[in-house]
Amino acid sequence: MSAKTVQGRNGKKPASPAVNLIAGGGAGMMEALVCHPLDTIKVRMQLSRRARAPGVKPRGFVATGVEIVKKETAMGLYKGLGAVLGGIIPKMAIRFTSYESYKQMLADKETGAVTSKATFLAGLAAGVTEAVAVVNPMEVVKIRLQAQHHSLADPLDTPKYRSAPHALFTVIKEEGFSTLYRGVSLTALRQGTNQAANFTAYTELKAFLQRVQPEYSNTQLPSYQTTFIGLISGAVGPFSNAPIDTIKTRLQKTRAEPGQSAVSRIMVIAKDMFKQEGARAFYKGITPRVMRVAPGQAVTFTVYEFLKGKLENSGWAFVGGNYEE
């Protein structure tokens, strides 16, 4: 069960799509429940206008979190969770299934070996695939919900978007279906670079641990080791594409002006950010984003490997072999 081959243990085929669906969906759901509050803080920091006021220090991630809880209760940290949970199962199913498919296409036809370049390209393609299929529409709805500053403790403080389904319906009704794909190019670029870095780092670290621990060369690593390398691999992506994520968030939060193209909107947003807030604005929310993504990947890989192993050992008809990271 080497990390750098598509061949499963004892010559079996890789895990079936059903295994990826169940294990990936379960892992993604756990990731969302554990890490969503940090994502809400990240979005609020990226949308904050405090940095535009002269002499006003931008609020940090801890202060932002405290402010949300104080004004909106702790449940305010989970705004948009419904949209995330609604898309997490297909997102993870598409991520792992498409990554495995692309990896098989790029593997050596005779030996099944997968190079680091092939791993990077497979991760890149998987990230773009999930962005177009699931992530962008989900994030448009999520960001609209997270951007609302109403208090969940006050029943008279009625928000525009009451839930994820209501937000989805309202956005489509008022702004059109195409709004769900606003910023899709940036989302695809972000997800592609994220998964390219994520899968490459995870695979290389897993291969290294298997080399120095021969007893795990053809089996799963201990869960604590999977968690550790998942944490490291998850921290790589955010630093490489933070400006993309910040611009994307602002693009998806606001309405489009009539006749304005996506490219021109991106340029206007980037120009205004730099002019009014400086270069640091492009890295707004980087701390909570790393704190959100890195633990999220640690949870995802750990839970995924655990569930996948259980499913494969259960003897279900779903099993097609061992999925390789």
UniProtKB/Swiss-Prot annotation:
Effects seen without this gene: Leads to fluffy and albino colonies, and reduced conidia formation, when all 6 genes ctpA to ctpF are deleted.
Per-repeat ranges for Solcar: 15-105, 117-208, 221-310
Cellular localisation: Mitochondrion inner membrane
Membrane spanning residue stretches: 21-41, 82-102, 121-141, 187-207, 221-241, 282-303
Membrane topology: Multi-pass membrane protein
Top-tier EC class: translocase
GO MF terms, alphabetically ordered: succinate:fumarate antiporter activity
InterPro entries in UniProt: Mit_carrier, Mitochondrial_sb/sol_carrier, Mt_carrier_dom_sf, TXTP-like
Alphabetical keyword list: Membrane, Mitochondrion, Mitochondrion inner membrane, Repeat, Translocase, Transmembrane, Transmembrane helix, Transport
UniProt KW Hydrolase keyword: no
GO cellular component: mitochondrial inner membrane
UniProt EC number: 7.-.-.-
Protein family (similarity comment): Belongs to the mitochondrial carrier (TC 2.A.29) family.
Role played: Mitochondrial transporter that does not mediate citrate export from mitochondria to cytoplasm. Its exact function has still to be determined.
The name this protein goes by in its record: Mitochondrial citrate transporter C
Taxonomic path: Eukaryota, Fungi, Dikarya, Ascomycota, Pezizomycotina
